Amino acid sequence: MSLKIGNEAEDKASSYLQKEGYAILERNFHSKFGEIDIIAKKENILHFCEVKFSQNYDPITRITSSKMNKIIKTINYYLLTHAHSCDYQIDAILVTPENIEIIKNISY
């Protein structure tokens, strides 16, 4: 996915989350292990969000076990370097031209 399309999908996802009552804490958090697209908080739960965009197939298929391992390592790094004492979950935000869908608490 091009950088422009990826940024637009993340912008849409961030706006959607804010409308749903989430506070956006960070976007594009990088570590040597990988990147978290959006880190948000709602009701004292941290949400580590992976945003996927697709025009012609189900975007969830692009979250592989390898990608999940990178996300988990990056989350662990984030939690070590930031003072948060709350529960967390990994969410997928699937963006298509017609829809935004959140799949909460994903695993692989």
Model-derived features with residue positions:
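Acidic-basic catalytic patches of nuclease active cores, encompassing PD-(D/E)XK
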Residues: 1-27
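Short, conserved glycine- and acidic-residue-centered signature motifs
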Residues: 6, 10, 63-68
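Catalytic phosphate/metal-binding cores of nucleic-acid and nucleotide-processing enzymes, i.e., regions
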Residues: 18, 61, 78-80
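Active-site metal-binding core of divalent-cation-utilizing nuclease and nuclease-like domains
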Residues: 23-43, 98
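A generic structural signal for short beta-strands and their flanking turns/coil linkers
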Residues: 32-34, 47, 86-88
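Conserved catalytic cores of phosphodiester-cleaving nucleases, focusing on short active-site segments
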Residues: 36-59, 71
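Short, well-ordered amphipathic alpha-helical segments that serve as non-catalytic structural scaffolds
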Residues: 74-75
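Domain-level recognition of nuclease-like catalytic cores that cleave nucleotide substrates
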Residues: 82, 86-108
